[in-house]
Structure formats: structure tokens, C-alpha cells
């Protein structure tokens, strides 16, 4: 089935009589709605310009834009949750750092500026995206990461599972636990953090109605 794409429509009302057909012009495609916030085609265009997510090797443009839409919906759900709960206003946001990073990913300020003009976008559109990225990352780092703890037993279990058992089938020597303890700790922290992020997203989605129309 062909995906349905909703559009915001501009009706041209001048210079037609009652017997004439009105002229309709598509102003902007709405690809999804999070709560009452539309995700527009131009939002995905901007996400493409700044590489909000990196394309996969051999990935088609259609598939890439679909992943971008999914990532943009997720970002909006998380941001709206922070806003609705008031947490947004209690976070230390480093918007300048994230703005610089997105501009760099887009090829620099001059390149991005030219691309924005070509696509009918403006710098405040970039700032809105920056705010969302900065807020979500701030919540992850300032609120979720401090909750994570890794026990000695968990590190030892990971050592057994990821190194001893895997290397046992080869002739390679197993490195001592002391040599890989820090790496295993980091791995377990990031694994637990990802689980916390997914749990947060699930809770946020319970309070935000999401409609995805296509692409």
C-alpha cells in the first residue's frame, strides 16, 4: 500500500469566481505528528543536512530518510516529555557545543547556510533542532547516567561470557581480568545506559500520541 502523506494546503482565493475551481498549492508535507507537534518534510530535510543519524553503507535515500524520520520522531517524543514534566528547565544545556557540532557535520557554517537557503530553511530551524538534541543528551548525561552502577560480580560475569568463553574455542591466550576490567566496566555502563534510555522512551510514548503518515 502506498503510504499516506498529509499536507498543509494553501488555498489561493484571489481571482476566481464561484464557478471556477480553486487553486490548491502544497505548502508543507506533514510526515508525522507527536502530540500536537507536526514533523514536517522540512524537518527531515534539515536532519539530512546535519546528519542527525549517519547513512548506512549502500543504503538508499528512501530508506535513509525513513530512518531519519524515525529518529526525529523519537527525538520529539523525548523532548516533549522533558518539557511536559518540567525537567527541561532544570537541565544544564550546552546548546553552543551542540550547535557547533551539527554545523560541523553539515560541512561548516558557509556550506550549511547555502543549503538552508536552497531548501527554504532558516537558522532558527537549526536552533530548534539543537535545543532538542542538547536537552535529550543533557537528560541522559545528568539524570540517567548517574543512576548506573556496575558491580564486581557483573564485571566478572562479563569477563567469563565475553572473553573466556569466546576465546576458549581458539588458541589465543585470554587476557587477565585486570587488563580488561576498565573496558568491561565501560561496556556494561553503556549497555545499562541504553536500557535506561529505552525504558524512558517507552514511558514517554505512553504520554505522547504518535502518528506516522509515511516515508
Model-derived regions, located:
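Positively charged n-region of N-terminal signal peptides that target proteins for export
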Residues: 1-3
Amino acid at each position: 500500500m502506498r503510504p499516506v502523506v498529509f499536507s498543509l494546503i494553501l488555498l489561493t482565493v484571489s481571482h476566481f469566481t464561484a464557478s471556477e475551481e480553486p487553486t490548491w498549492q502544497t505548502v508543507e508535507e506533514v510526515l508525522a505528528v507527536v502530540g500536537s507537534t507536526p514533523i514536517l518534510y522540512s524537518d527531515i530535510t534539515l536532519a539530512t543536512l546535519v546528519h542527525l543519524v549517519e547513512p548506512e553503507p549502500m543504503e538508499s535515500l528512501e530508506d535513509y530518510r525513513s530512518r531519519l524520520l524515525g529518529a526525529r520522531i523519537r527525538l520529539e517524543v523525548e523532548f516533549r516529555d522533558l518539557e511536559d514534566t518540567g525537567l527541561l528547565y532544570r537541565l544544564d544545556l550546552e546548546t553552543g557545543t551542540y550547535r557547533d557540532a551539527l554545523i560541523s557535520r553539515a560541512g561548516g557554517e558557509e556550506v550549511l547556510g547555502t543549503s538552508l537557503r536552497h531548501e527554504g530553511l532558516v537558522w532558527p530551524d537549526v536552533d530548534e533542532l539543537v535545543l532538542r538534541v542538547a536537552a535529550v543528551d543533557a537528560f541522559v548525561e545528568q539524570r540517567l547516567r548517574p543512576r548506573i552502577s556496575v558491580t564486581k560480580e557483573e564485571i566478572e560475569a562479563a569477563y567469563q561470557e565475553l572473553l573466556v568463553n569466546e576465546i576458549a574455542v581458539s588458541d589465543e591466550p585470554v587476557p587477565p581480568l585486570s587488563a580488561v576490567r576498565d573496558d568491561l566496566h565501560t561496556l556494561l555502563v553503556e549497555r545499562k545506559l541504553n536500557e535506561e534510555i529505552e525504558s524512558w522512551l517507552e514511558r514517554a510514548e505512553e504520554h505522547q500520541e504518535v502518528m506516522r503518515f509515511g516515508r
